[in-house]
């Protein structure tokens, strides 16, 4: 059934992720085969924050050996799936799991230590370079990328402290991974800080350019200085007049256009938007339907911003909405629904939301005639068979 939902809403592509440690299970092997058989192109990411506990016990990403362990895992995945998967990403949002896992302590392994963040950042970059080499050696013609959560980092106020804090977060969030991977150097604000963890030749090992830039984008960050935080900065609030989603994130579609242009100008890579969407307080109405107009409004404004960026020169090749289904979110469990398909968790019943039908129309229109997308976005959602 889920494969049919993909065909209806977004024919041609799905972005599932492997789980390190169980990726050779029959469940994931059969799943990959099933997607290909259903004429769905899988875009597979090797790492979505699920480090095996056994490796975590050995230091996880603070252990330099983790880079080679990851390369071995990439080689195994290439041999298992390379005959049916041609698009691989090494990591999903490395800035999130390193900064939030080792700096803020919000995600696993729950560490708050600025030095550990830098160590983890460097080792993840080494793992990326080693995995790119392994995948290219094992899968001829493979198309490779890394998926970055990237957004503008704006000061919460005009104070010099907040301005400096925003610049510091920008270096970690937006530059710590794509800069060494694509440009062969760390951002200026991180160059000296990462030096203690570098060995001769490391930047060359990391600098394994990929074929495309994967972008996850939701909203800009508003940043404030926070001396009590080990990182020296924290997250502030957007101005009061900025709309917010039900999860509290600012809704500012112009930030997506700004981000796409910045990526294009700095890295000159084809860009695929691999996550973009919003949480909404969805419920099944008396007619058995889910009317999620706020999500349609969000997607309309953000896809319009994306097409503005394309007209301004950004080389955007594709767009994936987050997400096909309501699912478990890292920071909020099942309390926030991002899907264009409603999932009744006790029964697992799927109910396409109003946004599902709107999005299916949008994708079909954009595929045939991109300039038609704004006109299409203004039309009410209709049922799609």
Q: In which residue ranges do the predicted regions lie?
A:
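Active-site region of glycoside hydrolase catalytic domains
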Residues: 2-36, 40-385
């Amino acid at each position: 059934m889920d494969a049919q939902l993909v065909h209806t809403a977004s024919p041609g592509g799905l972005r599932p992720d492997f789980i390190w440690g169980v990726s050779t299970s029959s469940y994931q092997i059969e799943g990959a085969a099933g997607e290909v058989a259903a004429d769905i192109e899988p875009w597979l990411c090797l790492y979505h924050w699920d480090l095996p506990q056994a490796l975590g016990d050995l230091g996880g990403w603070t252990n330099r050996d983790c880079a080679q362990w990851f390369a071995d895992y990439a080689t195994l995945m290439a041999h298992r799936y390379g005959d049916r998967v041609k698009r691989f990403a090494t990591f999903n949002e490395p800035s999130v799991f390193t900064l939030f896992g080792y700096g803020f302590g919000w995600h696993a392994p729950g560490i708050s230590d600025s030095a550990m963040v830098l160590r983890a950042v460097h080792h993840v970059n080494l793992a990326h370079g080693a995995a790119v080499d392994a995948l290219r050696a094992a899968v001829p013609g493979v198309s490779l990328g890394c998926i970055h959560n990237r957004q503008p980092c704006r000061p919460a106020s005009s104070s010099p402290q907040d301005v400096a804090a925003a610049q510091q977060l920008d270096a970690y969030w937006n530059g710590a991974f794509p800069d060494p991977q694509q440009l062969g150097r760390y951002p200026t604000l991180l160059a000296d800080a990462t030096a203690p963890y570098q060995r001769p030749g490391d930047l060359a090992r990391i600098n394994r350019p990929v074929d495309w830039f994967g972008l996850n984008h939701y909203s800009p960050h508003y940043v404030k200085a926070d001396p009590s935080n080990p990182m020296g900065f924290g997250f502030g609030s957007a101005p009061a007049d900025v709309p917010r989603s039900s999860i509290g994130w600012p809704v500012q579609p112009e930030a997506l256009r700004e981000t796409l242009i910045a990526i294009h100008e700095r890295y000159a890579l084809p860009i695929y938007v691999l996550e973009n969407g919003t949480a909404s307080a969805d419920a099944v109405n008396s007619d058995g339907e889910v009317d999620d107009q706020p999500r349609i409004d969000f997607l309309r404004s953000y896809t319009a911003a994306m097409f503005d960026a394309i007209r301004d020169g950004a080389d955007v090749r594709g767009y994936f909405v987050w997400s096909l289904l309501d699912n478990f979110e890292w920071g909020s469990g099942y309390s926030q629904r991002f899907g264009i398909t409603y999932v009744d968790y006790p029964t697992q019943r799927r109910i396409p939301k109003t946004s599902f039908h709107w999005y299916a129309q949008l994708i079909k229109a954009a595929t045939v005639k991109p300039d038609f997308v704004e006109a299409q976005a203004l039309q009410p959602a209709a049922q799609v068979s």
